[in-house]
């Protein structure tokens, strides 16, 4: 079932259908049929095909106007009636002041024995961090021991998968005493120094999502290739189109994010841990559909310590993850 955009007012969620998003898809479908009909016409003339091919060809071109027209009407209706309300809601400046800015940090880890120790130490030594949790997703090396020695509380998530590891991070963080929760990876690609930036944004949002879009903040030798960079940006804009008026989104693949406890508690029943490498896009889409305010914050991005095992292993794997993200945004996430 397709999720719908929403706004949250006084604790209630007012659901607004994503007419612009649906209309845009119908316009693209109509134009696709039209251009297919034109190409078919060229081949029909070259091959000198007569009836019934001519009738099929003309029907394809003429009927392509129906989804295009309906799509234009839906998009126009959204822009005229719904967009102002969604944009007005998203521009409310202060959600709620944060009195205690200390955070609980939850790190995902899988066979990260080389990086998890330095990563935990980096977060433990930050003055705003009150607790570091590491969720070990059945590592076969010394990840558990190294994380524990560095000062983290370590738990093992036996069910494999990035989504299940992240979901367990959320559950463990909610068991701690703290109103602000950081989700991150234990591979040293992200640093604790960016916590200050994330916390600075949280008074304006329920969720602050890190973005690696700023070139000057990325190390030259990261696993984020040019293909991954622009593919990630494209999916971010698709998310923005789906939730038009709710914000600007440029990075759907970043694990690093700061979440208010009450927001995460609202989202937990809606999240599906079976969603794997595309879980971050699933999280953002679900948060926006639930009426949470989501803001992006530029963060630094560094080379990975150890061997990458996620969606950044290669461009081919990144393409597969990206396509699953697109399918989730268009047709809904498994179990949603």
Where are these regions (language model features)?
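Hydrophobic helical membrane-anchoring modules
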Residues: 1-97, 272-336
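Acceptor/aglycone-binding surface of glycosyltransferases and processive sugar-polymer synthases
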Residues: 158-160, 164-173, 180, 192-273, ...
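N-terminal signal-anchor transmembrane helix
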Residues: 77-128
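Short, structured coil segments at secondary-structure junctions
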Residues: 128, 149-151, 290
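Conserved short acidic donor-positioning loop in nucleotide-sugar-dependent glycosyltransferases
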Residues: 123, 137-138, 160
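A conserved acidic beta->alpha catalytic loop
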Residues: 136-144
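Short beta-strand-to-loop acidic/aromatic patch adjacent to the donor-nucleotide binding site
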Residues: 177-189
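Donor nucleotide-sugar binding loop of glycosyltransferases
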Residues: 112-115, 139, 162
């Amino acid at each position: 079932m397709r999720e719908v955009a929403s706004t949250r007012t006084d604790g209630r969620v007012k659901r607004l259908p994503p007419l612009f998003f649906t209309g845009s898809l119908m316009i693209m479908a109509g134009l696709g049929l039209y251009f297919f009909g034109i190409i078919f016409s060229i081949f029909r003339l070259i091959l000198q095909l007569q009836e019934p091919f001519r009738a099929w060809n003309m029907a394809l071109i003429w009927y392509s106007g129906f989804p295009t027209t309906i799509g234009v009407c839906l998009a126009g209706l959204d822009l005229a009636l719904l967009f102002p309300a969604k944009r007005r809601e998203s521009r409310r400046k202060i959600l709620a002041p944060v009195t205690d800015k200390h955070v609980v940090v939850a790190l995902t880890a899988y066979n990260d024995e080389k990086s998890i120790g330095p990563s935990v130490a980096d977060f433990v030594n930050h003055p705003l961090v009150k607790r570091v949790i590491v969720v070990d997703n059945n590592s076969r090396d010394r990840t558990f021991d190294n994380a524990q020695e560095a000062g983290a509380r370590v738990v093992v998530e036996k069910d494999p998968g990035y989504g299940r590891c992240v979901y367990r991070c959320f559950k463990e963080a909610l068991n701690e005493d703290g109103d602000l929760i950081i989700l991150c990876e234990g591979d040293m690609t992200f640093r604790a120094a960016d916590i200050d930036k994330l916390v600075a944004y949280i008074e304006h949002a329920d969720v602050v999502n890190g973005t690696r879009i700023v070139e000057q903040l990325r190390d030259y030798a990261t696993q984020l290739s040019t293909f991954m960079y622009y593919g990630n940006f494209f999916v971010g804009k698709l998310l923005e189109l789906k939730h038009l008026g709710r914000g600007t989104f440029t990075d759907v693949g970043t694990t690093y994010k700061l979440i208010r406890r009450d927001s995460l508690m609202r989202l937990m029943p809606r999240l599906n841990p079976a969603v794997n490498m595309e879980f971050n896009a699933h999280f953002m889409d679900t948060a926006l559909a639930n009426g949470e305010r989501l803001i992006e914050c530029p963060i630094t991005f560094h080379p990975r310590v150890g061997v990458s095992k996620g969606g950044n292993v290669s461009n081919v794997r990144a393409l597969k993850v990206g396509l699953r993200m697109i399918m989730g945004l268009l047709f809904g996430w498994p179990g949603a």
